[in-house]
Amino acid sequence: MTLEMRMVELETRQAFQDDAIQALNDVVVEQARVIERLQLQMAELIKRHEEMVGQYGSEGEEAPPPHY
């Protein structure tokens, strides 16, 4: 294998690696967006849950059944 052939091979590999790195970066960016949306949704659900517990009391505070 000549030096020129080795250089071409290395440059080809580098081009494929650059493409792979860009594709992986795109996936990471999209996952970060999804995580951010999920965190916002979770915060909203926690807020709603706390409001409901405040309105109706927690499960431990249930009144006894009517037959008591």
UniProtKB/Swiss-Prot annotation:
Gene3D superfamilies: 1.20.5.300. This is Protein SlyX homolog. PANTHER family: PROTEIN SLYX. It comes from Pseudomonas putida (strain ATCC 700007 / DSM 6899 / JCM 31910 / BCRC 17059 / LMG 24140 / F1). Belongs to the SlyX family. Pfam families: SlyX. HAMAP family: SlyX. InterPro entries: SlyX.
